[in-house]
Amino acid sequence: MTETYVRRLFDQYAGRYDAALTEHLHYRGPALLRDAVEAAMRAAKRPMHFRAMLDLGCGTGLAVAAFRAVADRLIGVDLSPAMIAQAESKGLYDRLMAGDLARFLAAESAAARQYDLAIAADVFVYVNDLAPIVSAVASVLTPDGILAFTVETHSGDGVKLLPTLRFAYGAEYLRAVIAAAGLTLRSLAAAAIRTENSIPVDGIVVVAMHQAGRGFA
């Protein structure tokens, strides 16, 4: 799926995005991510607090509202300038960037910037091969940093292009991608992320962390 296609899709969608997801698609991604991260922090006996948080594919800022109170500094990046404009109007972020995720992460890594939480809510479904992007995120996490994301799934293995032009991923594929990035999988839970034509969409909520944080239990 090309960068141009995704940018144009969401530039056109930006003005009605929040209403479409929350009112018509019953989107649950932000709440599911918040619950999964909170459970991981609770299991580790660590406070639900993050010095620097990165919202990948932040869109209009729907997901970050669930985390703003627990993040000192919040950075968002999205391919669509129109979505970024919507996010900026909410005043939730300390920094917003319009651009490609891979290029943004490469620049952050080169600048030695680090985040103790990175989230991607309903973002990776537009990426065929997750290995490069997950590895890039790992490169900007603190030694005990966390990556949490939602994706659609299917009953088979590997990656499948759906009729919606979104990708779905098998559980074993996700496990392999996490391991290849040098991250430790903390949870991989099935969940209905949203509905499509009133039918629940099968998804997975993933929480992973840096190998350096093996004490996380």
Can you say where each PLM-predicted feature lies in the sequence?
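Core SAM-dependent methyltransferase catalytic element
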Residues: 195-217
